Regions:
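A recurrent flexible, glycine/aromatic-enriched loop bordering the glycosyltransferase active site
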Residues: 260, 268, 320-343, 347, ...
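A short, conserved alpha-helix in the catalytic core of glycosyltransferases
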Residues: 348, 358-385, 413, 548-552, ...
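Nucleotide-sugar donor-binding/catalytic module of glycosyltransferases
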Residues: 142-405, 415
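Short, acidic, metal-binding catalytic loop of nucleotide-sugar glycosyltransferases
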Residues: 211-220, 468-478
Length: 738
């Protein structure tokens, strides 16, 4: 049997070869003969079966795999006749990897052969030629698009997550298949060079990589394999067999110099305008080059593009997805969330000197940090497409040599800040293998003065707790406290104020009888403050660790940061605030509410600092510059609810960065001081605030850069949302100096 892509065709049950193998002649010896056609996860999409019986009519059947083996309900009877052309579209990838053909239900002799084709057009040309030769009267049986994946019904949770990933990928690739191709503007014949360092790669890895490259449906690309002096006979034999293969360029280095050196050797041979780097066990996703080319054509200003990832096992079965946020320079200091598939401009790579030696295990991270320096964020694009498959196995480099890779990553991060003239140390994050940048402060007197603004009325237990926490459990050396009181009458509270005013310099209680309006309270506090920056603090908050305020203030060292939010927990140690997603529920909402306090979230992002569009006003630091630029809080439209979202979105649209940090962690006994918004006048007021938020910020259509468009927006714990359209490339958002 002739195959362009390797097929494992098993003659099972009641079948014997008849005559010479090249004749493809078989004899059925019973009433249930069948062939099982097995194809790989990555394959050519069109399978054509030629079936012919000269001496009598036969009654073939096709069995289509739907996830539970081949059963009678999967059978598709075909017409009765003597000659058949059976066509099946199995797609370019999938985890359903078999088709069964029963040639007849009785003893007979017949010819059976199978071909695969890269597309429908090539298949039709081959069918026409075959019909002209000897199958003019063949019955055409088109099985259509076969299921690529198993149905997601009644699966346990782990298998469901894997199946969701597969279905998500399938939907993206089907949408991309119908996409017309547009080549990006380029002065070079090759617009994209893919460079892969190789060392002792198994043959099947190289086969998968090459097949995934060949399956791309756009011209103008090259694949460069740079071998790091492999010793494996299997790898070397694979090279020898492809010595004359003009589809790939193989660079065979004579000495083993490591990944960085081998990659640089490959980069020196690249001729494309753009360059992508992959590992030898990676796979290029279906239609990836076409989707990327279209994006580059639409964004000629782009200087860097990165994509999402499909996580697969050793046999390429989908296990999960890595859906990334839009570019986040703060998150990047904690983890290389960008990784692959990333596109660099070749001329800039040449200018910075390619990869540096000495960063083994994190050489890509170091390259990324160096490459992105000085590039405006408006030229850094995130393409939400699963453009490559990361084969995650026990032998993955970053797992096998994790200590070396972690140390190299921290050295690269420290070096990145040093080049900008900022001294930092890099410590473990809440996940030990991830990273936390700590900015150096030479003297305690160098910390800027912070004006802490606390709205309050009565509530002795709450206000006494937070004031005690500030003065006794907070190690920040330079702050004042302004309690903005809208009419306390409790003698204990008034006495507490008087005591603090006598004993704590910088403490003031500004009392004015009026209806509670959070925005007005904040405006009063900021007007009367004397600090360099402003910290808004609810009265129902408790300090957990003493360094929380230093952490929040230190985040202002990140470029253009205007607002910083903290990690807040309910009293039962579950998450109350890990950042606000604009558009969640059509308005804005906290993501991952009620998760355990140590919950890491997607890509462990909740263990790291993140750029957000919004954070809660319960614990919110505002830089003086941002406060002056954005102006007053909106006392008319947002008296109690959503005022923090409105203020953050105004700052975000003005180009200020908003950071959420998990390293400042406090308890928040939410709304104990003002009650519920679910009934009476409070509900009427809250409904008006919702309408104001929609009207002023169009939150229903807001694309929050912190949330990948592959996640649903209907609930706090967002799951995968099967796409109906391909999401466009995304930017972080409005920019100041960025």
């Amino acid at each position: 049997m002739t195959n362009r892509v390797k097929l494992d065709i098993t003659a099972a049950n009641d079948l014997l070869p008849s005559g010479e193998p090249e004749t493809n002649t078989w004899q059925s010896t019973g009433n249930d003969p069948f062939f099982r056609i097995n194809y790989p996860v990555l394959r050519s999409p069109i399978i054509v079966v030629f079936l012919e019986c000269d001496h009598r009519d036969i009654d073939p059947q096709a069995y289509i795999q739907r996830g539970s083996g081949f059963t009678e309900k999967d059978a598709t009877p075909l017409p009765i006749g003597r000659r058949f052309v059976i066509i099946a579209d199995v797609g370019r990838f999938g985890i359903n990897c078999a088709l069964r053909i029963d040639p007849a239900t009785f003893p007979c002799t017949f010819e059976f052969s199978v071909e695969t084709y890269a597309n429908r057009q090539k298949a039709e040309r081959a069918i026409s030629l075959r019909k002209a030769e000897d199958m003019a009267e063949a019955i055409r049986c088109d099985l259509g698009r076969l299921p690529r994946f198993r149905p997601n019904i009644g699966l346990p949770s782990l298998r469901r997550s894997r199946n969701d990933a597969a279905a998500f990928a399938q939907a993206q690739y089907q949408l991309a298949e119908a996409l017309p191709a547009t080549l990006p503007a380029s002065d070079d014949t090759i617009w994209l060079s893919t460079v892969v360092p190789v060392y002792n790669a198994p043959k099947r890895y190289l086969d998968d990589l090459l097949r995934s490259f060949e399956n791309q449906d756009i011209p103008g690309t090259q694949l460069i394999l740079s071998d790091d002096a492999s010793t494996s006979e299997e790898t070397l034999r694979w090279y020898d067999e492809r010595a004359e293969d003009d589809r790939i360029q193989i660079v065979r280095n004579t000495t083993n110099g490591g990944i960085a050196k081998a990659t640089n050797a490959g980069l020196s041979k690249a001729t494309g305008t753009w360059v992508a780097l992959l590992d030898h066990d990676d796979v290029i996703a279906p239609h990836a080059f076409k989707v990327i080319a279209n994006t580059l054509a639409q964004h000629p200003e782009a200087r860097f593009v990165y994509t999402d990832e499909l996580v697969v096992d050793d046999k390429l079965a989908p296990q999960g997805v890595m859906l990334k946020p839009a570019y986040d320079a703060v998150l990047l200091t904690g983890v290389n969330y960008i990784n692959h598939f990333s596109l660099y401009r070749r001329e800039r790579l040449e200018r910075i000197g390619y990869l540096r030696l000495g960063f083994d295990g994190s050489q890509d991270y170091d390259l990324l940090l160096r490459y992105l320096e000085g590039i405006p964020e408006s030229q850094i694009l995130h393409l939400p497409y699963l453009a490559y498959w990361w084969r995650r196995t026990a032998a993955t480099y970053s797992q096998k040599f994790i200590e070396t890779a972690t140390a190299a990553a921290r050295a690269a991060i420290k070096d990145r800040f040093a080049r900008g003239g900022t001294a930092v140390t890099v410590e473990p994050a809440l996940t030990n293998t991830l990273h936390r940048v700590e900015f150096a402060v030479d003297n305690e007197t160098d910390w800027p003065k912070i004006s802490i603004i606390i709205p309050n009325r009565d509530k002795f237990d709450l206000i006494s707790t937070i004031l005690g926490n500030l003065y006794e459990r907070t190690d920040y050396p330079n702050f004042e406290v302004l309690v903005i009181d809208n009419g306390s009458t409790d003698p204990k509270v008034l006495e507490l104020y008087a005591d603090y005013e006598r004993t704590r310099p910088g403490f003031r209680a500004l009392i004015k009888e009026e209806k509670f309006n959070f925005s007005r309270s904040i405006n009063r506090g900021m007007f009367n403050a004397s600090g360099e920056h402003f910290l808004l603090l609810n009265n129902d908050v408790e300090v957990i660790e003493s360094n929380w305020l230093k952490e929040m203030v230190s985040c202002l060292n990140f470029d253009d940061t205007g607002i910083v939010g903290a990690k807040l927990l309910y009293g039962d140690d579950t998450l109350q605030h890990a950042g606000v997603i604009t558009g969640l529920g059509g308005l804005a909402g906290h993501w991952y509410l009620n998760k355990p306090s140590n919950f890491g979230g997607p890509m462990k992002r909740l263990h790291l600092r993140n750029s957000m569009t919004c954070v809660t006003g319960a614990v919110m630091l505002i830089s003086g510059e941002c406060a002056r630029a954005i102006g007053a809080w909106d006392e008319e439209n947002f008296t109690v609810g959503y005022n923090d979202v409105d203020y953050c979105l105004r700052a975000y649209k003005a180009g200020y960065r908003i950071i959420w940090t998990p390293y400042a962690c406090l308890y928040h006994h939410e709304s104990q001081s003002r009650g519920s918004d679910k009934s009476g006048e409070s509900k009427i007021r809250f409904d008006k605030e919702k309408e104001s938020l929609r009207r002023l910020h169009d939150t229903g259509a807001f694309d929050d850069p912190a949330l990948n468009p592959g996640y649903e927006k209907g609930k706090s714990n967002p799951g995968l949302q099967i796409p109906r359209t391909l999401a466009a490339a995304r930017l972080r958002g409005p920019s100041r100096s960025r």
